[in-house]
Amino acid sequence: MKFPKATYMYWQKRFDRPNPDQEIEEKMLEMRKEHKDYGCLRLKKELENQGIHVNKKKIQRLIKKLGIEVKSYTRKSRRYNSYRGKVGTVAKNRIHRRFYTNICHQKITTDTTEFKYYEVDTTGVVRQKKLYLDPFMDFYNSEILSYRISEKPNALAIMEGLEEAIQMTNDCPFRRTFHSDQGWAYQMNAYKNKLKQHKIFQSMSRKGNCLDNSPMENFFGLLKQEIFHGEVYRSLDELKTKIDQYTYYYNHKRIKKKLNWRSPVQFREAVKQLSNS
């Protein structure tokens, strides 16, 4: 096929011209490696944090050009339910979905979620096993303050996580509230007495109402979308390592719009620095 000389020269100049977006494209490719669920807006804000200002339409065009659209795999699965009936005292719902607070370490929430993995036993048979995660989150900035990982629902793991969360929030100048669902572990005398010992209010969601603890449910959803759904884990250690890595990433690097495009730790430290200046 023959082209007019003018057409040939036009495209030759286009191909020879340096790519004006090369730096931006390289930055975006680097970001996609670390932030697998970042869409257009978060990529734009990350670029701005590095001093690169680009409009939204250009970001969308470059995402399509580079083939880095978000492709996280999601799947609905049965939610783990720790409710075993009334095995102790059920606390009243003090939070009432009032999750917002401008006071660090004042409102804390917790819950348990379940993961599945596979291991080959001594006879060579592949067995499905379970792992349980018990985190404590600060409503102030959605930071995960403490967490424990165990192979079965475990009162000791929850009490250890509770103790660590209490110690980390001792600097709060106001009386604290620790929220949860009505799971068996949170009705235990040991759990309730530990809160009373530190003069902490206990709050519980209404029975079977996961929206009463939606910030924690959102964290579980993000965690499973990023590292669990669509993946197969062959050992406890492999899955545990992934959870450890993601929790650090979530706390220190994953920016949130409600935190002025900072990560939970970045937001907390920025506010602290501002109040000390």
Question: How would you describe each model-predicted region?
Answer:
Residues 82, 86, 180-182, 188-189, ...:
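RNase H-like two-metal-ion nuclease catalytic core shared by retroviral integrases
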Residues 3-7, 23, 157, 161, ...:
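Generic alpha-helical secondary structure signal
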Residues 5-103, 209, 263-271:
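Basic, flexible linker segments flanking DNA-binding modules
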Residues 1, 8, 28, 43, ...:
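Mobile genetic element proteins and their domesticated derivatives, centered on retroelements
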Residues 129-130, 148-171:
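Active-site beta-loop-alpha junctions of metal-dependent nucleic acid enzymes
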Residues 10, 141-147, 202-205, 229-230:
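Short small-residue beta-strand/loop micro-motif enriched in glycine and branched aliphatics
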